[in-house]
Design a protein with these regions (language model features):
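Conserved catalytic cores of phosphodiester-cleaving nucleases, focusing on short active-site segments
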Residues: 430, 455-461, 469-480, 492
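Domain-level recognition of nuclease-like catalytic cores that cleave nucleotide substrates
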Residues: 497, 503-529
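Active-site metal-binding core of divalent-cation-utilizing nuclease and nuclease-like domains
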Residues: 144-149, 438-468
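Metal-dependent nuclease catalytic cores in nucleic-acid-processing enzymes
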Residues: 183-191, 341-349, 431-436, 488-508
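Mg2+/Mn2+-dependent nuclease catalytic core
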Residues: 174-180, 478-495
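Structural motif
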Residues: 154, 470-474, 506
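Phosphate-binding site recognition
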Residues: 1-422, 441, 445
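Catalytic cores of nuclease domains that cleave nucleic-acid phosphodiester backbones
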Residues: 415-451, 455
């Protein structure tokens, strides 16, 4: 076995040996299906700690002819699939970890030459009669082997994008690397010697102008995951099973780590879920993953609407974006949407394909973004926070007149940034108004299923604050009075579902008169009859 060619199954065995392993081998049924077809070129991008390397190790263990993996996979999902052994350990597998190669190569400028030299050296051990010393190109070496023997290769590149991210301003390094990838995978000759190509990293494939640099690859991303959706992170069903096994509070786990919406799946951060199961501590595990420093300069770029969008999402709103203009690198940002799309790929935002909108997915990310914003002391954020604290205090004091005046003030000051021209707009203003709840409350739940309908907003206090802070059930009315909102809360029994969390509940009815441009408020304390 070599380091890059037929490296065996020991790396994947480490994952299987771990206390928690969630079976994602069902993905192999898809890669088996597309083997040696036009769909055999795959790029799957996902955030750090979302299982990129484990997936790459799994593919290597399954396809690599340098080991025997039948026993390893037979009890897993793929072991029950038809044709399980057809492709098992049948191919020469080249597995490259670009991040690892950076250090022995001596820096990003040497990575391509290092990979080429070391991989060809290992290939000569397998095919000494076919590869003369004169061959110094890896694509040419693979082509020569294929021509002489008919042998095709599975090529797996982990952290494919590290040179795009870490050498983002070195255009010479990037051009050399992109040309290397094109030589490996584009054109008629690679079609002959590639059985399967699998690239994985944080960013999708870099665009040259508006086209992917490797436009023969099918891309599965955090904005369009398709068949990969249940193999990126942990699904809700998988997390529920782990919570049952480890006796963890599922609803609290959902508040903290859920929120990535991929197709029909609610997807959780696997790193955080595993840490929670083992240590039973609800906290952010995100800052240890290395991207925190990257987002501070991103969110402070001077693009119209960027800071307002961040504040809106921190307060619980979603923001419509166009993810198609992002060039899939860390340099060529042209607008707010490019920054937000980048944050989606980094895992700091979720994305809803149906509404084309970005949002803060969970409490863990909400805390990290809030820290990043506070670190730069945004004037916009500090102003919002001060006015929001006054609004929250007035709500908790049941001072309805002050609540109405505070919301009206926020409306008047920020209506230019947040359009206040339709029935959904008061919801956005209300969310921003209660921005300061992020310290004491979980992310507000919109359209909370309760009683005989859906409450507009429900704010549930975090467990450590639940003795001092009531849950808030908030109903909005457009061109109706606030008392009507309170009656709806009571008649449709919205508080009953909230009593599963706490009996300390405030009912807040807020109305907006479009003609008069005024707000009214009624607040009552909930009491079971």
């Amino acid at each position: 076995m070599g380091r890059f060619v037929n490296s065996g199954n020991s790396a994947f065995q480490v994952a299987l040996n771990s206390e928690i392993y969630v079976d994602k081998t069902g993905l192999l049924a898809y890669t088996n299906k597309v083997m040696d077809t036009t769909a055999k070129f795959i790029c799957n991008s996902r955030p750090r700690r979302f299982g990129k390397s484990i997936t790459a190790d799994m593919l290597t263990a399954y396809y690599c002819k340098g080991c025997s993996s039948e026993e390893m996979f037979s009890s897993l999902e793929i072991g029950q699939a038809p044709g399980f052994t057809k492709y098992l350990n049948q191919y020469d597998v080249i597995h490259l970890d670009i991040q690892w190669c950076m250090e022995p190569a001596g820096g990003p400028e040497n990575v391509v030459s290092y990979i080429t030299e070391k991989t060809i050296l290992e290939l000569r051990n397998y095919y000494p009669e076919i590869l003369p010393d004169s061959i110094s190109s890896l694509p040419e070496a693979l082509s020569c082997i294929n021509t002489a023997t008919g042998q095709k290769f599975v090529v797996i590149i982990d952290e494919w994008d590290v040179l795009i991210r870490d050498a983002s301003t070195d255009l010479v390094v990037q051009e050399e690397y992109i040309n290397f990838l094109r030589g490996m995978f584009k054109g008629s000759e690679p079609t002959k010697y590639i059985q399967l190509a699998y690239l994985t990293g944080i960013l999708p494939i870099k665009k040259i102008k508006t086209q992917s640099a490797l436009n023969n690859f099918a891309e599965f991303t955090m904005t369009d995951a398709r068949i990969f959706s249940r193999y990126i992170g942990f699904t809700e069903e998988e997390v529920r099973m782990l919570c049952e096994k480890y006796h963890r509070d599922f609803s609290k786990t959902k508040h903290w780590y859920d929120g990535y919406l991929l197709e029909q799946y609610q997807v959780y951060n696997p790193k955080a879920v595993v840490e929670l199961m083992i240590w039973n501590k609800f906290q952010s595990y995100w800052s240890d993953t290395g991207t925190y420093e990257a987002i501070v300069p991103l969110i402070n770029m001077d693009f119209d609407g960027l800071k307002t969008a961040i504040i809106e999402m921190l307060s619980g709103n979603s923001v419509e974006i166009d993810p198609t203009t992002f060039q899939n690198d860390m340099v060529n940002f042209t607008c707010r949407d490019d920054i937000l799309t980048c944050l989606i790929h980094l895992g700091y935002l979720g994305y809803d394909q149906d509404t084309h909108s970005a949002f803060v997915p969970n409490e863990e990310i909400r805390q990290e973004l809030a820290k990043a914003v506070k670190r730069k002391k945004w004037n916009e954020f500090l102003t919002f926070q001060q006015e929001s604290s006054e609004l929250l205090d007035a709500t908790l004091d049941m001072d309805a007149d002050t609540v109405a005046r505070s919301i009206e003030k926020i409306h008047n000051e920020y209506a230019s940034a947040i359009q206040y021209n339709n029935e959904n707009s008061p919801s956005s203003i209300l969310s921003i108004g209660y921005l300061s709840t992020m310290r004491y409350y979980f992310k507000p739940i919109r359209e909370f299923p309760a009683g005989r309908g859906f409450a507009d907003f429900v704010y549930l206090p975090k467990p450590e604050y639940s003795r001092d802070y009531p849950a808030l059930v908030v109903e909005l009315k457009w061109n109706q009075n606030a008392q009507t909102a309170i009656r709806q809360i009571k008649n449709r029994q919205y508080p009953e579902a909230v009593t599963n969390y706490t009996d300390n509940i405030l009912l807040v009815g807020i109305s907006y008169d479009k003609k008069q441009k005024t707000h009214n408020c009624v607040i009552e304390k909930y009491s079971e009859k």
